[in-house]
Amino acid sequence: MWHDRWQDVRWRALAKSSRPILVGPWRSELGFETLYWLPWLAQWRHRYGISRERVTAITRGGAGAWYDAARSVDLYDYVPVAKVRQAMLRDSAASGSIKQQASTDWEAKLLPFIAQDLGLRRYVVLHPSLMYRGLTPWFNGQMGQTELLTHLRYTDVPVPAPPLSLPLPEKFVAVKFYHRHTWPMNDEIKGWVVNAVANVAKLIPVVLLESGLYADDHVDFPLSGPNITSLAGHVTPQNNLAMQSAVLAKATAFMGTYGGCQQLAVRLKKPSAGFYAKFEGTCYAHKIMTEWLAVQLGVPCFIGTPNDARFVKEILG
């Protein structure tokens, strides 16, 4: 995107102005938000000298805490979780993807209401579609990592402290196993997950990062047992992602489905193990970036199948 001369001229003009900037609304995948959107915004602000005081982040589930912005707005204060989920599913049906490749009509109608509540009359919108437009060549295998990294700036992700009302063990493993196309909730995988989590719980307390909300097409595996506690019941739509990140930041390690939560764990510099059954219907570039980032941060990161994990265990004795 930086190489688009006319877009570059536009951003430089914006940098010289004092107009407030509404960033978002982000309503899509957690992994893309942490792996690409946040570092893309950081690089954009750095390149054009945009002050954080001008930025209002619009996201959901309390994830505004992760943004280096003067303030944040939660989508769920304006739109129910079910309607945001329905919008994602409509996008998927229309384009085959839930990625925000373009601004939708309902987003265009919502933003003026948010601006009015913020007391803004003249403002600029930085929509996620701009990031997707710039990084699509990477997702499609037409951009090298060296060029990709000119678009991204990885900085520490700020997270809130967990509330005092949430009892957490001194040391624990955060766990989030959920159904997705690479990790379907069939009997074989469900049995493996139940056994794996129970084995971990024999060694160290387990805290499940489950919300009880149906914000997307992911469904948490039902887990319970000795030394296992759940975040469900302690979260609301407006704070569920903030709470999950707060707990994850306190964890000793993360284990779960390979995907967005593991990518957040890597961003938070937590050792992680993420699992898939078949690597289909997802972009290999995201796995590359997750592993690359873990190497840069010096954080252990395993991504593989149960058989891969079994092989590592056997070869190490």
Locate each region found by the language model.
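Active-site and donor-binding regions of nucleotide-sugar-utilizing enzymes
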Residues: 6-119, 243-246, 261-264, 275, ...
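Well-ordered, non-membrane alpha-helical segments in soluble/globular domains
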Residues: 37-44, 188-199
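Catalytic donor nucleotide-activated moiety binding site of glycosyltransferases and closely related
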Residues: 58-60, 170-171, 175-181, 191-241
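Short, aromatic/basic amphipathic alpha-helical patches
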Residues: 62-77, 109-110, 218-227, 285-293
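Short acidic-hydrophobic, aromatic-tinged amphipathic segments that line or gate anion-handling sites
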Residues: 74-86, 235-236, 295-310
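A nucleotide-sugar donor-handling region in carbohydrate enzymes
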Residues: 99-179
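Nucleotide-sugar donor-binding patch of glycosyltransferase catalytic domains
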Residues: 231, 262-317
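Acidic donor-binding loop of glycosyltransferase active sites
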Residues: 249-255
